[in-house]
Amino acid sequence: MLVDSDGDGNTENDADLTGESVEWKDVAPGEYQINLSVMNSAGKMDGDKIKVYVSFYGHWSDSDWEIAGGNSNDPEEIQFDMPVMYDKEAGNTIRKVELILTYPQIDDDCQDVTPGEGNNCRNKLDIYAYNEEDEEARNTTETPLDGRDHGDCDDDDDCLQLLLSSYMFTETESTFGDGDWVVAIHNEKINDQKIESFVIILHYK
């Protein structure tokens, strides 16, 4: 028998937990309403409702991590799925998305393939963000090489940040909607390039 414990008319969305101390795991990012009920030893019950905001922090790094070479006509990408919720009526709205990419400015094993025509070994990676319809929403290509020093960045690294505001996930002619977005590390240079780390942060309050 299915029991609608939270009284919302849906018997499949209850995550009821009982006890003085409970663990609520495997929760997708977003906004949730918690209905708390407390019963004392005399059987008297009281309750309250609170909002809980679940954000997400994803960090990827590996000493051997690299992206294959590409070019401007056929860039190489490493893609990450990024579900985003913006539901104004339900009050479940993303506040912002923060993407941070760190990579070495020059790889130790790089060889300049076009000697005499500048330093081909100077790395340049970018972050791209695509909405559910695979439309390109934003990228970091216009960030100059000497401006890639976000946060506590080592002198030998580039540290690149891309911020996506909540407005970008609304439904207008000039915005891109919510849903199943994809973010990508993007390489248009012919050389393989090492990657130090990539971070995705979804802020829900």
Question: Could you say what each language-model-derived stretch is?
Answer:
Residues 5, 22-32:
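Residue-level recognition of secondary-structure-to-loop junctions
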Residues 11-19:
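Short beta-strand segments within Ig-like beta-sandwich modules, predominantly Fibronectin type-III
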Residues 22, 44-55, 198-202:
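C-terminal edge beta-strand
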Residues 36-38:
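Hydrophobic/tyrosine-rich beta-strand signature of extracellular beta-sandwich/beta-rich modules
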Residues 42, 58, 115-134, 171-205:
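C-terminal edge strands of extracellular/lumenal beta-sandwich accessory domains
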Residues 54-77:
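Low-complexity, Pro/Ser/Thr- and charge-rich linker/hinge segments at domain boundaries
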Residues 72-150:
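Acidic, Ser/Thr/Pro-rich low-complexity intrinsically disordered segments
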Residues 94-95, 147-192:
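Noncatalytic modules at the cell exterior or secretory-pathway interfaces
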